[in-house]
Amino acid sequence: MRCPTCKYNGTRVVDSRPADDGNSIRRRRECEKCGFRFTTFEKVEESPLIVVKKDGAREEFAREKVRRGLIRACEKRPVSAEQIEEIVNEVERELRNIGDSEIASDLIGEKVMNKLANLDEVAYVRFASVYRQFKDISVFVEELKDLMEKNKDR
């Protein structure tokens, strides 16, 4: 690997350990010429997931979009950045485990809502109100009733 400082092509691995829950390897490297130390990450290259939108349009799955939606829903709620990142990781892992290269956008939204329902009810309602595009208050109230019923069963 090329040194980012002097561009010499010879480096040696000083330390290697699992990262990202075993999904990647973090390596500390040292340039054999100038001694500069830097970190690299090695990760399996995965084939892209294609999201099929409601209008039939297709685009590559973007973790950042899921993360932004979660951050917005969890704003001013007792949900940590680590919990949000874990939801993003779980949703992506579940989608990849389906084994299909094309995923309906509805499925992504449902998976995120299921995770939020178990984590924070207010964040769940916020996300659901945007995702399900509540047209009026009666639909919103119905969603709240469903959530309250589910909580009785817990």
Curated annotation (Swiss-Prot):
Organism name: Listeria welshimeri serovar 6b (strain ATCC 35897 / DSM 20650 / CCUG 15529 / CIP 8149 / NCTC 11857 / SLCC 5334 / V8)
PROSITE patterns: ATP_CONE
InterPro entries given in the database record: ATP-cone_dom, NrdR-like_N, RNR_NrdR-like
Family: Belongs to the NrdR family.
Stated role: Negatively regulates transcription of bacterial ribonucleotide reductase nrd genes and operons by binding to NrdR-boxes.
Protein's name in the database: Transcriptional repressor NrdR
BP GO annotations: negative regulation of DNA-templated transcription
Chain intervals annotated as zinc finger (unnamed): 3-34
Cofactor binding note of this UniProt entry: Binds 1 zinc ion.
Lineage: Bacteria, Bacillati, Bacillota, Bacilli, Bacillales
GO MF assignments: ATP binding; DNA binding; zinc ion binding
Key words of the record: ATP-binding, DNA-binding, Metal-binding, Nucleotide-binding, Repressor, Transcription, Transcription regulation, Zinc, Zinc-finger
Segments forming domain ATP-cone: 49-139
Tagged with keyword Ion transport: no
Names of the cofactor(s): Zn(2+)
